[in-house]
Regions:
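Active-site-adjacent structural elements that line small-molecule/cofactor binding pockets in enzymes
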Residues: 1-282
Length: 282
C-alpha cells in the first residue's frame, strides 16, 4: 500500500518505471470503521501473518484513483492497475468516468482489477450503503454498467441493483473496446464470474500451497478455450518473491508483490529486488 508514511507516490511511479517494472497496482479502502465486528482476515485466517486488527497501512492508504491518475501524469509506459477496485463501494456512473479519464489521459495504460470486498470488512461496505449479502450480484451489475458506459454512445442499464436510462458519458477509454477487466477473488464461483464478466483472473496467493491454484488456472483456460474465448490472463496478487518459479511454472502472466511501507531506502531496495527478478524471468 502507498501511504502518507511511505515513499512519495510520484517518486515511486518514476522509479518503478525506470527500473523496467511493468505495472503498479493500488488497493482500495476508503476508510476503516472505528468499531468492527469481524477480525481482520475473517474466521478462515486468510492472513495468518496479521491476525487481529488491520495493519497500519489500511488506515493511511491514499485514494486509489487519484493516486493512479497522478502516477500516470509522471510516467509514460507504466501500467496503472486497481488492485482491486471495490466497485460495490463506488457509484458506477462516476467510476466509469474516472476510470475512462485515467485510461484516456495515460494513453491506454489502465488495468481494471475488480472485487466485491471481503465479509470481514462488512462495516466499511455498510457505510457505503452496500449489503454484504448481495455484494457479488451488485458487483456483477456495476461491472456491466461500466462496460456499457465505456462502449456505447448512449448508455443505459436496467438491472436489479443498477438502473439508469440513456446517458452520455465521455471521455471513452483510450483502449478498445475497453481496459482489461481483471476479476479478483478466490471463491468457488469466481471462475464463472471471470468467464462471464472479465478478461482476466486476479487470484490472491494466500498460503504456501499451489495445487488448488494451479488446478484452477488449468480449469479456467480449458473452459475459456471450450467457449471460444481468447486466452485468459492470470495475475497473481499478494505474490511472494520466494515462489516466483512456481508462478511461472503454473503459467501466471503477471505477479503483483506487496510493497512494504517503510523508509525510502528500504523501499528502493525492495524495488531493485523485484526488478532483478523480473529481468531474470523474462
Amino acid at each position: 500500500m502507498n501511504t502518507d508514511e511511505g515513499i512519495n507516490p510520484l517518486d515511486l511511479a518514476r522509479e518503478v518505471e525506470d527500473l523496467g517494472i511493468e505495472s503498479i497496482f493500488l488497493p482500495d479502502h476508503s476508510h476503516v470503521p472505528v468499531r468492527r465486528s469481524a477480525v481482520y482476515g475473517g474466521p478462515r485466517g486468510i492472513f495468518p501473518d496479521s491476525p487481529g486488527d488491520m495493519p497500519r497501512e489500511y488506515y493511511r492508504n491514499r485514494d486509489q484513483l487519484v493516486t493512479l491518475a497522478a502516477m500516470g501524469a509522471v510516467t509514460s509506459t507504466l501500467k496503472l492497475g486497481t488492485g482491486v477496485c471495490v466497485v460495490v463501494q463506488r457509484d458506477p456512473i462516476q467510476l466509469a468516468k474516472e476510470l475512462a479519464s485515467i485510461d484516456e489521459m495515460s494513453s491506454g495504460r489502465l488495468l481494471f482489477g475488480v472485487g466485491a470486498g471481503a465479509p470481514w470488512n462488512i462495516e466499511e461496505m455498510s457505510n457505503h450503503g452496500t449489503d454484504v449479502r448481495t455484494r457479488t450480484a451488485l458487483m456483477r451489475e456495476r461491472i456491466e454498467a461500466i462496460r456499457t458506459i465505456w462502449t456505447a454512445e448512449q448508455a443505459e442499464f436496467h438491472g436489479t441493483h443498477v438502473d439508469f436510462d440513456p446517458i452520455f458519458s465521455w471521455p471513452k477509454p483510450s483502449r478498445t473496446p475497453h481496459p482489461p477487466i481483471l476479476m479478483g477473488g478466490d471463491g468457488p464461483t469466481v471462475l464463472d464470474r471471470v468467464l462471464a464478466h472479465a478478461d482476466g483472473w486476479m487470484p490472491g496467493h494466500l498460503d504456501e500451497t499451489f495445487d488448488g491454484l494451479e488446478d484452477r488456472i488449468v480449469e479456467l483456460r480449458e473452459r475459456a478455450t471450450a467457449c471460444g474465448r481468447d486466452p485468459i490472463e492470470v495475475t497473481i496478487y499478494l505474490g511472494r518473491i520466494t515462489h516466483i518459479e512456481e508462478y511461472i511454472r503454473m503459467g501466471a502472466d503477471r505477479v503483483v508483490f506487496t510493497l512494504p511501507t517503510g523508509p525510502v531506502e528500504e523501499t528502493r531496495m525492495f524495488l531493485a529486488t523485484v526488478a532483478d527478478l523480473a529481468r531474470q524471468t523474462v
